[in-house]
Amino acid sequence: MAPPAGGTAAGSDPGSAAVLLAVHVAVRPLGAGLDVAAQPRRLQLSADPERPGRFRLEMLGAGPGAVILEWPLESVSYTVRGPCQHELQPPPGGPGTLSLHFANPQEAQRWAALVRDATVEGQNGSDSLPPALGPETRPVSPPSPLEVPTPKAPKPKVDLPWSPGDLMEKEELAGRLTRAVEGGDEKGAAQAAAILAQRHVALRVQLQEAYFPPGPIRLQVTVEDAASSAHVSLQVHPHCTIRALQEQVFSEFGFPPAVQRWVIGRCLCVPEHSLAFYGVQRDGDPAFLYLLSAPREAPGRSPQRPQKVDGELGRLFPQSLGLPPTPQPTSSSLPSPLQPGWPCPSCTFINAPSRPGCEMCSTQRPCAWDPLPTASIQQLPKVTRREDGPSLPGPRSLDPLLNLSGNLC
């Protein structure tokens, strides 16, 4: 029987050459459908008697007298895809790229190490052979290639960042991990997670919406900045994250996420957590939003969407305040005197001169700040500017909510 293209038929006597290692694998064409069954094959690495210092890779079929396909080791491309999954790409004209599955991960690791070292030995042209290992021989550490003053061997081929086959395999592994975790298969989940970790696959693991309380619900939000406060109602879902909530407020009202600080249940919220994580489950649950001073834009740049700043709550939410819109200041208005104190480098809050840490975020007072003499400064009472009209229920200061001395989540 004539051998297929890309391989040379050899005698069926494995003892005709020095066999370094032989392993049993399940072989199937790469990218073949699930209906294509894997075929049992025997791979063996042996020294080439006709070319000293060179090696050849042989694939034996099942049964006596089966044709052996063999290739010079330097003509094939061998890639490790996982603990038990390797790929063999014969030279052009052969059977195409083959997927090799090992039953034993230790045997697969030993085989890959020997193929790698034999490839380096062949590229360096060394006459020394790696030690022969039979199927029952205990694995030993392969000898390190000797450093010789020859040009370095070319680096192995690096996989492209994206390819259709690689993407399909990663998605299949992610699906396998999901099904294993959902079904309580700890072993299967560990195997899939190990392969994904070896390939440094970036994943996003989150609970399905079915595990959260039903929505949508109305979230009652008290909004406050350095000048005023207001009450608004937002339609949200309990599975919504704080980051998504920040984007919703940015889209509806123009306050960028960088100036938003959310407090729910006496906890300073983290963008990655969900509303349900902080106890938001039903209509009317309260939340608190404090707006920091808007960050300054870099010179020459303009914001893509309008961004609101301090003092604009009265113009944004006149209905929630029950008041007419705040009148615009006239040119004859005198500027307010500067508030004594030191600005927080983290949240820009103006703190009292005698306060050692920020009242909002507990950041330590800058060492370079030089307070004015206490004799020339009178402690001013802390006030909040309010529009003329009825007082609003709810908190007017962050003090009752942002107890940052130890109650942060």
Swiss-Prot record:
Task: Tell me where in this chain the Ubiquitin-like domain is found.
Answer: 217-280
What Pfam families has UniProt attached to this entry?
A: LTM, Sharpin_PH
Task: Give the residue ranges for region: Self-association.
Answer: 1-178
User: Could you give one GO CC term from the UniProt record?
Assistant: synapse
Q: Indicate the quaternary assembly.
A: Monomer and homodimer. Component of the LUBAC complex (linear ubiquitin chain assembly complex) which consists of SHARPIN, RBCK1 and RNF31. LUBAC has a MW of approximately 600 kDa suggesting a heteromultimeric assembly of its subunits. Associates with the TNF-R1 signaling complex (TNF-RSC) in a stimulation-dependent manner. Interacts with EYA1, EYA2, SHANK1 and SHANK3 (via ANK repeats).
Cell compartments where the protein resides: Cytoplasm, Cytosol; Synapse
Q: Where is the stretch described as Interaction with SHANK1?
A: 173-300
Recorded protein name is Sharpin
User: Bias regions of kind Low complexity — which residues?
Assistant: 318-336
Domain-related comment: The Ubiquitin-like domain is required for the interaction with RNF31. The RanBP2-type zinc fingers mediate the specific interaction with ubiquitin. Binds preferentially linear polyubiquitin chains and 'Lys-63'-linked polyubiquitin chains over 'Lys-48'-linked polyubiquitin chains. Also binds monoubiquitin.
The species this protein belongs to is Bos taurus (Bovine)
